[in-house]
Amino acid sequence: TLLKTLMGERLADFTIRGEIQTDLQSLAYIPQHLPEDLKKKTLHDYFFLDSADLDYSILYRLAEELHFDSSRFASDQEIGNLSGGEALKIQLIHEFANPFEILFLDEPSNDLDIEMVDWLKNNIQKMRQTVIFISHDEDFLSQTADTIIHLRLIKHRKEAETLVEHLDYDSYSDQRKANFARQSQQAANDQRAYDKTMEKHRRVKQNVETALRATKDSTAGRLLAKKMKNVLSQEKRYEKAAQSMTQKPLEEEQIQLFFSDIEPLAASKVLVRLENETLSIGQRILSQGLQLTVRGQDKIGIIGPNGVGKSTLLAKLHQLLSGKREISLGFMPQDYQETLQLDLSPVEFLSQTGHKEEIQKIQSHLASLNFSYPEMHHQIHSLSGGQQGKLLLLNLVLRKPNFLLLDEPTRNFSPTSQPEIRKLFANFPGGLVTVSHDRRFLKEVCTSIYSLTEHGLEVVDLQDL
């Protein structure tokens, strides 16, 4: 919404207050999702129907850099029929080959493989124009951004706050952690001092009350009553002072989850062995000659270019593992709708028995993930992608699987949630196979990485990521 507002779009469903001053003549924009009107355009019309300002030398150079066949520019293929990665590539080529003063990007790394993410990072670093982008990818943020605009909901997601810091992402993240620790310590100190003061006050008050009840002398009684009035006045001053004490900070987006009571399979137990396997969709061969052995406590990461068949490989592993009695399999798809029942509420989706105790436990878990009570009982389709992702994580934790298959597990989570996601899966006692282009996730969670190519799986050194 902020991005579209800065671009000058009128948003009928939102109230925009304030003033935007700009003298920009040209801008470039790549949205998170392919617009409906663009889906119906052919590649030819997209590139050449209105090409007065198109720089053809840049156009063909970018096609080569992004490994996109430039002969397809004149194709009648509709953009909506391209893969997510290809659709993003042609938008990057189109927007970068036209002149612009400012570039707006919405989650640009979502549909790019690691090689293409590196390409985009390098181009942003070299750009002289202003770039404003939304991203959840910490590695991408840390290597491109020099100013952070942090939009967040505080006070149990009831109040909006905007922070602007002219810092790179890692410095901003370190500053947030330091501020959080400092405020937590100050809040604890204030609370201890307040408790000590109130304990002393309660003793004085109790002594005066005891003396009042025991006295039979009217003069002494009047003096004690006056003293009690002063004590009560002091009590009100303490209560008022308590309102200005440093409050314990809440990490609004923190994910407080961990796997417990997991019975992992033996580390040496072979679950799947692929030998000279072929991956295909219909008649189209994606990759062949695959060799892979998966054991009970392996943590395997799969990387590779878009369209090579990473999700297809994960689906094959899902098929092979699902039929094994000793395996309790957890699955987190890239498209949450494959698992979530969108017409149910989060509580209904997570509940297996409907018993009161189970419902209370589920609501407690959801509350720890910053779900409001209404969100717990609204239909899942009304939740944001991040909230739906949290729901899937909680479902995994509650089902107690001993092996996991994860397809881009960090895709919809905010940067402030990412460290907790990595910690959750790094500490998972069972095994997992994950498809990801998130370098930090791969390095902190996985013990082995494979790159999927058309010729099979190749071992990748973690240090080379």
Regions found by a protein language model. Give the residues of each.
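ABC ATPase nucleotide-binding domain signature region
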Residues: L3-Y56, T147, R152-R157, G296-K361, ...
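ABC-family P-loop ATPase nucleotide-binding domains
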Residues: Q25-A87, N98, Q334-N395, R399-P401
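Coupling and communication elements adjacent to P-loop NTPase active sites across diverse families
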Residues: L54-Q77, Q175-Q283
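Hydrophobic anchor residue at the start of the ABC signature
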Residues: L92, L393, I421
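Walker B catalytic motif
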Residues: E107-P108, D113, L405-P409, F413-S417, ...
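Conserved H-loop
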Residues: D137-Q143, E338, D438-E444
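Conserved beta-strand-loop-alpha-helix hinge in the C-terminal portion
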Residues: L153-Q185, L452-L465
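Flexible loop/N-cap segments at domain edges
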Residues: K248-Q334
